[in-house]
Amino acid sequence: MDGLHPASWMLLLGSLAFWSASSLLLFSLALPGARASNQLLSECHNGKGKGINCSELTVRESEVRVCDESSCKYGGVCKEEGDVLKCICQFQCQTNYAPVCGSNGDTYQNECFLRRSACKQQKDITVVARGPCFSDIASGSGEGEYEGSGGEVHKKHSKCGVCKFGAECDEDAGDVGCVCNIDCSGHNFNPVCATDGSSYSNPCLVREASCLRQEQIDVKHIRSCIETDETSIMGKKDEGLQNRPEVKDSTDQREGDFMGNYIPCSENYNGYCVHGKCELSYSSQKASCRCDSGYTGQYCDKTDFNILYVVPSRQKLTHVLIAAIIGAVQIAIIVAIVMCITRKCPKNNRGRRQKQNLGHFSSDTSSRMV
């Protein structure tokens, strides 16, 4: 190094200065481009990049994308796994059935399931109504979480205006109006107290009254509002029958479409009724329980202790009859054995006495003959 010529030193220092200046120049030129690229990427990601070719940024997005507020919204948690970003939706939703209608037209089991679906889809979904979304034809949707979708949300608009709470517009009749095709004749006696302060014989009559009055009436609690006031239950039922609009004849051409007012619930409602059968109203798309004998409650989960006797089903009745016949035969056999034993004992005693008398008689006669 000491032997280098001064000219060589000058050449070496000049080269180092040139490379340093070139590096600084390239860095200063690249910095505004990087800032502009990040700004364009942010605008494209937030949907504000109008007029910008965002397709060219798809490759670079994976290189610079990080977890921020826009990466995972609606209650999700953003997590980086290597070069991949994942949005984790940790919602511990309870399984209670409190249906809500979402802004996307889907019915969710409860509000928690709606928020979880919004997180998974990264879409803004809000509650538009409490209760299921009413639709003419239900169809499956997204995640299958007790959902059903339809084009109309919660109300049906027609020539009648707005038919709510399960009512249908009868446009074929001369007097166009809302008709309630709700048949509660097949429901067991399961008294409930409604939010209007009246008692009804079963929840079906509550839905019928809500449909007839076109106002919101729900089940407040199980059993009548005043347990001893049985007349209020029957009076409410008679009142509903008197004010009930005329229902079209069962030979209506729409009978094939309805196939009855109630249809069996889908597999999504498994376990909804504890001791009973789940039925879905075709018009209102609301689930209800037809409780087995001896059970009551909205979900047939309470034992009805007021019932004096329980009428068994056809299969159980057959078993009861067979058991009764077998028991009767056993009782008859036992009675016959007892009667046979009690009758043999006196005969044996009389036989022994006759033999003793004959013995005495023979000895007396023999002595007399001698």
Curated annotation (Swiss-Prot):
Family annotation (Pfam families): Kazal_2 (PF07648)
Membrane topology: Single-pass type I membrane protein
SUPFAM superfamilies: EGF/Laminin (SSF57196), Kazal-type serine protease inhibitors (SSF100895)
Cytoplasmic compartment residues: 342-370
Known tissue expression: Expressed at highest levels in brain, and at lower levels in neuroendocrine tissues. Present in neurons from the diencephalon (at protein level).
InterPro entries, A to Z: EGF-like_dom, Kazal_dom, Kazal_dom_sf
Site residues, Reactive bond: T95, N96, G186, H187
Signal peptide start-end: 1-36
Location in the cell: Cell membrane
Parts of the chain that traverse the membrane: 321-341
Topology Extracellular: residue spans: 37-320
Family statement drawn from the similarity comment of this UniProt entry: Belongs to the tomoregulin family.
Described function: Inhibits nodal/nr-1 and bmp signaling during neural patterning through interaction with cripto.
The protein's name: Tomoregulin-1
Organism: Xenopus laevis (African clawed frog)
Encoding gene (name): tmeff1
